[in-house]
Amino acid sequence: MKISLTAATVAALVLAAPAFAGDAAKGEKEFNKCKTCHSIIAPDGTEIVKGAKTGPNLYGVVGRTAGTYPEFKYKDSIVALGASGFAWTEEDIATYVKDPGAFLKEKLDDKKAKTGMAFKLAKGGEDVAAYLASVVK
């Protein structure tokens, strides 16, 4: 069986590409829905996105242990998730924003797990996650 060099190169690139890829530029626009509750403020006080403080500051959320932003009072379930060693990835953020309650119930294996985030983002979670990752680079 003959495989062309082009086909082999394309296959290698597809296999090497990350399975998760959001668009940070689209995510920046989509984040307008999020700023109703969240802001993005750098440690030096620079307001990247001025938003409400109903939810935690999302600066540096990718890689952060869940439920640990010091200036926010989290619900018990998200604190328990963090206590288990869980740290946010872009993929997890994208899944979480689709259905925060279902995400916590699955991750904690607890049907009674509750979230403080009632909003569900049906589409664009990957883009928002990519945007959140990009603001700290």
Swiss-Prot record:
An individual GO BP term: photosynthesis
GO molecular function: electron transfer activity; heme binding; metal ion binding
PROSITE patterns, per database record: CYTC
SUPFAM superfamilies attached to this UniProt entry: Cytochrome c
Consequence when changing residue 108 to T: In strain: 2.3.1
Post-translational modification (record): Binds 1 heme c group covalently per subunit.
Keywords (A to Z) from UniProt: Electron transport, Heme, Iron, Metal-binding, Photosynthesis, Signal, Transport
Keyword GTP-binding annotated: no
Source species, domain of life: Bacteria
UniProt binding sites for heme c: 34, 37-38, 117
Signal peptide: 1-21
Reported function: Cytochrome c2 is found mainly in purple, non-sulfur, photosynthetic bacteria where it functions as the electron donor to the oxidized bacteriochlorophyll in the photophosphorylation pathway. However, it may also have a role in the respiratory chain and is found in some non-photosynthetic bacteria.
Family from the record: Belongs to the cytochrome c family.
Name of the protein described by the UniProt record: Cytochrome c2
Encoding gene, per UniProt annotation: cycA
